[in-house]
Structure formats: structure tokens, C-alpha cells
Amino acid sequence: TMLDLSMGLFSRARVRFVERLRSLKLYLLIGLIAAALAGANLLHLFDPISILTRTCAVLLYPLTVLFANLSLDVLRPAARGLGWISLAYLNFDQPLFSTALLTAVIFTGIVMLNLITPRFWCRYLCPLGALLGLLSRFGIFKRVVNSRCSCCAKCQAACPMGAITDDPRTVKAAECLQCRTCRVICPAEAISFKAVYSPFREDATLSVDMRRREFLLACSGGLAAGYLFTADPLRKARPDTLIRPPGAIPEKDFLTACIRCGACMKACITNTLQPSLFDCGVGGLFTPKALLRYAACEQTCNLCGQVCPTQAIRNLDLEEKKYAKMGTAVILKEKCLVWEQDKACLICDEQCPYNAIVFKMVDGVRRPFVLENKCNGCGFCENKCPVEGGAAIVVMPLGEMRLAEGSYHAAAQASELTLEEEKGYDDFILEGEGPGPVKSTD
């Protein structure tokens, strides 16, 4: 539909491509299957559903919110004058994504291919179209042309996929979208689509000529790509700042299951989840990561797991999600205001929902420490740290809990992870000299 809407922007002059190019999408399909057998999920690079949903989530959705806020800014003076207070102060949180520009380039490139020929992507590159073409021989509906056909070829010229042959009465069913454009444009009303009951249709044979050499090249290319992606040294050299969403399954399975659709990032109410670039190699491109310096992970939200279509992020209830430990906060003493400059700062402790920050007397100054068994890596401390630039306390994937199945709560109990909110008193001083517990302001 997106390509159909965009075709009106371009001239009708097209370059006619040889039928041989139609085999490209089949080669891509074979290569992607071979890569999957080699352990690499590369579907997100060519799957139109993943590309479209990712474009909507990362690019079109933020633009829609921006347009809505700009429209509200125009209406605010009138709303204030009319006393419509709710409208006067209404505003939507503006989501931002780091790969918006790259996504725009990819989407624009696919659309611009229409300059060459209508639906270039669908005709020559789409592996999903190749798969549906293979399955078309089992299709229910068939294009039928009756005796009123005058062979005017109007249907042939109008077909967006070029599926109608030189004889307008026949069609390559493997290329036909069943869009009914030919039926609408036919001046003699000679075209109809009727249900057929034959499990194998003669007109549905694949409209490409695949040689054995080309088939083997596609297979070997896919296997080689799969090997290169899985053997990428950056895949194992995961950076300390790469934090996955709560409930994400183990990393190897996660990279295989995630289709990079962007649904979790769009659903994230704090805009914490951002698409990765090459943080863990090419294979991690567009996978979600938690950018906790930008925003913490809201503890009363589990939308990312609810919307994940492949359960790369498990759908956990709020209590279970709390124990899906994302990592552990680590204090960078060389940047911390208390450790480096002996200043009085309690912000990380004030922000921690589970009292995982405690203070000990060191060299006569109260200095912060992290209790690893009370930290689930939510990132409130990192997000609110007053140090300019990178925070002095950062969440690293140390002790992260990634389960493909089973209870996070039970696993947390086994590892002595306690995440109960403690009211009343914070144990600021655990060892050494100094006053006793200081009453919490909570």
C-alpha cells in the first residue's frame, strides 16, 4: 500500500526489465533460509513486514507526534481565550530514536526504486513475495477471462506487478497480487476472480528459470553470510553499556528470535528502549537496548513484553518483570562527586526504588556503595545522576537474569536477590564511624 501511494509521485515513464530479474527475490529467499540454517537471522534486512513496522515505529510515529504537538501549539492561544484549559496545556511526549535517519534512508530508497519500475521491490527483491509465489499454486481464487475479452491489453498495462503475459487472457499466478485492478479497468467486464478447488493449479508455476548453479550459489551465499554474522568478533565482545529489555531471553536466542520490528521501542512509555547499531556486531543491528542515561525503566510498565510478536522479550506480569534483573549499577569513583570531590550528594540513593545504595564512612566522608543483591538494573540512579555527560553510576549487564522459560521470581530467590521497597529508615552507615541510621524522607 505504501508503494502504491508513492507511485503517484513519479513519472509514468518506466524502464522495462527483463523477466530474468524476477528470480532475484527467489535467490534472496533461498539465501535467507540458508543463513537461518547457519544460525543467523537476517530476515529483518529484507522482510517487508519488519521493515514497515520498524519504519512506522522509529520514523513515522515520532513524526506524527511532532505534527500533533505543532498543531496543538497553533491552537493554544485560541484554547486559552475560550477557557479550554485541558486543550491549552495538552502535550504529547515526543519520542526520539537514534536510528531514525538510517531508517528514513532505507525506506526512501525502497520508495525511490519506483522510479525504475512500478513496485520494483515487490517484483524483484521481496523474499516474502517469492514465498507467497511458491504457495500460490495452492491458492483458492483464480483469474478468469471470458469470451468478451477483446485483447485490448489495458489490463496488461495497468497491472502493478506485470503479471499479465503478452496474451492478456493469461497471468503468471505466482506474480499476481489478486488486487483486482485488471477487473476494474477492463472495458468489456470480461475479467473475474472465482474460487477453484484444484490443490495444484497449472497457472501457478513459478515464473523464473532457476539453474542448478544459481541455486547452489544462493545456498552457499546464504551459508557464508550466516557464518560471517555468527562469527563476528563483536558479537561476543558485548560492550558493558548494552542493556537488554527486562524479560529478554538469553542473548544468542534473543538475536535469533528478534525480528527488529520496533514494536517494543514504540510501546516503551519512557522512550528508554532504543535501536542498536553495531553495539554487538552486524547481527545486533536494530535490536532493542535500554538507554538508561536517557530514561530509566519504569517499574510499573511491562508493555515491551506484551507487544513482542516473537517473545524475544517475554510477556511477564509486573511482579515477575521486577525480578527480571537487567544488570547491576556500578559506581565510577573517578567521576562520582562524593568519591572524587568529597561533595555531599545523595541523588542515586534517593532515586533507587529498592534502597540498593548505602553509604559507608571512608576517610571521614560518607561514600556510596551498591548492594548487588538489591539492584535490578532499573537505571533510575544512572538517569538522575547530576554529573555532566556520562553518569558516575552506570548499569552494566553484570548479574543480568535472562531466562528462556521458568519463573524469574524463583530464580531471584535462588540467587538471593531481594527487591522489596523498604520504608522508614535507610541504613546509610554500615561500617566504620559515624552517626546511626538517618530517617528517610520518603
Regions found by a protein language model. Name each.
Residues T1-E175, R180-D442:
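Non-ligating segments of multi-cofactor redox enzymes
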